[in-house]
Every structure is written in C-alpha cells, then in structure tokens.
A protein has these predicted regions:
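Extended, composition-driven regions rather than compact fold-specific motifs
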Residues: 1-270, 274-418
Length: 418
C-alpha cells in the first residue's frame, strides 16, 4: 500500500502544481457553471483541462440541490449523444466494416457527458469526489437523473475493477482515521465505543480485512470482520461481547465472517464482497492451514416483511409473542430456500449474496441476535452460510444454472420434518 500511496502523493502534488499554475496562466475561470463545462470540454491541453476540471468540480459541489438538478438536466440535453452523427457512423460501418469505422461508432454512441466525468476524475481526489457526487444524485430521487446514476456506475465498474483493489489488514494499531471510518461504516452490528471496537480488532482471535482503492487510500471500500473459533457460535453475542475468553488462534478450527460492511452508497451496484470473502478465506487458509471451516453468521434482514406477506398467520402469532419455535423454523426455511421472486433468486438479500457467491445454507439459529435491530428484522434469527473453498466456484455455477439453494443435511432434515 505504501507504493500506491507514494504514487498518489506524486500525482496529487502534480495536480496542485498544475492548478496553481493554471489559475495564473489559462485565462478566465467562469463562475457560470455551464460556461465552465464548455471550458473543460473544449480544451485539448492536458494541464489546462485539469485546471478547468478542478474549477468545474468545485462549482458542482457548491450547488444546492435545486441548482444541481437544473445543471444536470441541462447537461443531459446539451451533452447527450449526437444521434445524427451516430446514425451516419453506423451507416458507414455497415457499408465498410473496419477498425476505424467501428471506433467512430463507439465514440459517437457515448454521451459527451461521460467524457466530462472522465476529465473530472483527473482532479485532486477526483475519484472519491465523483463517488460522493453519485451518492448525492441518488439521494435526489429524480427520475431524469437516473441516466447519470447508471453512467457513473458504468465508469466506476472500470475504475474499481477488483484487480485494482488492495487488501489490507485492519487491527488495533491501524491509523486512527481509518479506525474511525470502521466505526462509522459498520452496517451490521453497531460499534458503540472504542472499547467495543478494540474487542473486535485487538484480540489475536479476531481479524478484520478491508479493500482499498489506490486513489482513496485512507477510506475503505468494504470490510469484513472475522472471528476465529473452536466451535461454530450460535449467537452474535458470543462473538462481539467485550468480556469474553480469548482463544489461541492455533486452537481455532473455524473462521466466522460475522459482519460485512459496504462503505460508500456512491458505489452501490459494484459487488466487492464476493471477491473480499474469497480472498480473505484463501489468505487465512494459507496463513493458518489448521482452519477447516469458513462460515458466516448472518442476519436475515427481510424475514419479518416476507412473513407478513407470505406467512401471515405465523406473523400474527409472532407479533403477539405466541409463536412456537417449530413454526418459526418452518417459515424461516421456506424464506431462505424457496423463492417468491420473479427472478428465482433467494428472498433474503444476504442469502442472495452468499448463495450467489457459492456458499451453502448450513444452519439456522433461533434467538441468535437479541439486539433491537435483530429482533425487529428477523425475531433474532440468524443463519450460517458455509464456504467450502474446494467447491465454492462449482456451487456458484450450479446455483445460477438451476436457482436451487444448496443446503446442509441438517437443513434438509428440518425441511422434511416441517
């Protein structure tokens, strides 16, 4: 990571130098945001383009919501695809299929505003700032702006390709500003204090790993928390409580992935988690060959809403706190193994992620999460998903072929029973 940080430092110094030089040497920097766009798009010089882009991105960030919506809609009109040119280029290519004519079709089929965002990416911290811009666009909930939402997502899929990402271990010695981000971004089991965080990072039987992008080195994209265990825990309290007995990692036989948090809403739609879990599991296996199981302890965030619609009698009983464990187990198995979706994917979003990633449903745990959040979303029920590294890719392929959730013998037995 130091190598990437050195490169980043060099790039940022150059950008700031260009910007200082540019303010003196490249003429007027327009306060009118639409004229500022023209300056960025009409400039061919690399340095001047960076200067104008820096100025424009600052103007965009300073717009209030109404002005931002107006600006983006103008951008959509004035820098859209030139359809006449596209039709012309397609006709030329149809009559003579060669490399240059194909390149012309590719160029004319892309909206001009896409190139604008590429140029904005060259600014100081441009990648991060565009991620925040997409996050803001999504919050505006304007249907016409969905074009920019999807357009930025397509760019991010290139810029955040997994081959560019760096896996870093997070521990109690990690720099404080990153630890603060871990507290802020934890999305599954809230971290309420520094003591709480220390209990998850400091003990030798607790691990945390994060993906970083070289251009955003101090802000994780996604992180996973791991517990090394002798036995498979049935409750989240066993894992995250502060006053517990630490075990020697050499005595552990199981790694439990108990929390996976995506850190930026501006990157929604890019799946980092599947690469992260498999990478971490592979690394842990190399580091600690005695680990023979990799499982999750996962929430069921959609269970109660599903039950209200598809198992209303059980829902009413549970609402009155008059629901037997057998009935809860029966409906939970239905929820996790039988799809009510048109696409045939699992009902539960966490199950969709893990099953689609090649894991299998191993166990269902009643009374596993007694936090307010856990009770409100799933009556405290959690699930274990097993990652068998030898067949995880095979499972992935089979699932997307036939949409059948692979389950353990225990789950199969319970399903027959109920």
């Amino acid at each position: 990571m130091n190598f990437f940080r050195n490169i980043l430092s060099s790039v940022m110094k150059s950008t700031r130098r260009f910007n200082r030089f540019g303010l003196k040497s490249f003429g007027k920097l327009h306060k009118d945001i639409n004229k500022a766009v023209e300056s960025v798009m009409s400039t061919s010089g690399e340095v001047s383009s960076m200067v104008y882009a820096e100025h424009l991105l600052k103007l965009i960030e300073d717009q209030n919501d109404d002005r931002l919506i107006k600006f983006l809609k103008n951008l959509l009109v004035n820098y859209d695809i030139d359809t006449k040119r596209l039709i012309h280029d397609v006709k030329i290519y149809a009559s003579e299929k060669n490399e240059q004519n194909l390149a012309n079709v590719n160029a004319s089929s892309e909206p001009k505003w896409v190139e604008l965002f590429r140029r904005l990416n060259s600014t100081t911290n441009g990648t991060y700032r565009l991620v925040k811009l997409r996050e803001r666009i999504r919050l505006l909930k304007d249907q016409q702006l969905k074009t920019f939402d999807s357009g930025l997502l397509n760019l991010f899929k290139y810029w955040f390709n997994p081959s560019f990402l760096v896996l870093e271990k997070i521990d109690w010695e990690t720099q404080a500003n990153i630890l603060e981000k871990i507290i802020e971004y934890e999305a599954v089991h809230e971290i309420n204090s520094w003591d709480d965080l220390r209990a998850r990072l400091a003990p030798s039987d607790r691990k945390c790993f994060a993906f970083f992008h070289p251009l955003i080195p101090n802000d994780p994209l996604i992180f996973v928390e791991v517990a090394l265990c002798k036995n498979i825990p049935k409750t989240i309290e066993e894992i995250i409580k502060i006053d517990r007995n630490e075990i020697d990692p050499e005595d552990a036989n199981t790694a439990i992935f108990y929390s996976i948090s995506n850190c930026h809403n501006g990157l929604l739609g890019i799946s980092f988690g599947n690469f992260l879990i498999k990478k971490v599991a592979s690394n842990l296996k190399k580091e600690m060959p005695h680990l023979d199981q990799f499982q999750t302890l996962s929430p069921l965030p959609g269970l109660i809403k599903w039950m209200e619609k598809y198992a209303p009698i059980t829902f009413e009983k549970c609402s009155d706190k008059n629901c037997a464990d057998d009935e809860l187990m029966k409906q939970t198995i239905r929820y996790l193994t039988e799809s009510n979706r048109k696409d045939g994917m699992p009902n539960d979003p966490v199950a969709r992620f893990h099953i689609g990633n090649g894991a299998s449903l191993e166990r269902i745990n009643l009374n596993a999460d007694k936090s307010e959040k856990g009770l409100d979303q799933s009556y405290g029920i959690m699930a274990n998903y097993l990652y068998d590294l030898d067949i995880v890719e095979e499972n992935h392929e089979l699932f997307f072929k036939d949409k059948i959730v692979k389950t353990s013998n225990n789950i199969k037995s319970l399903k027959k029973k109920h």
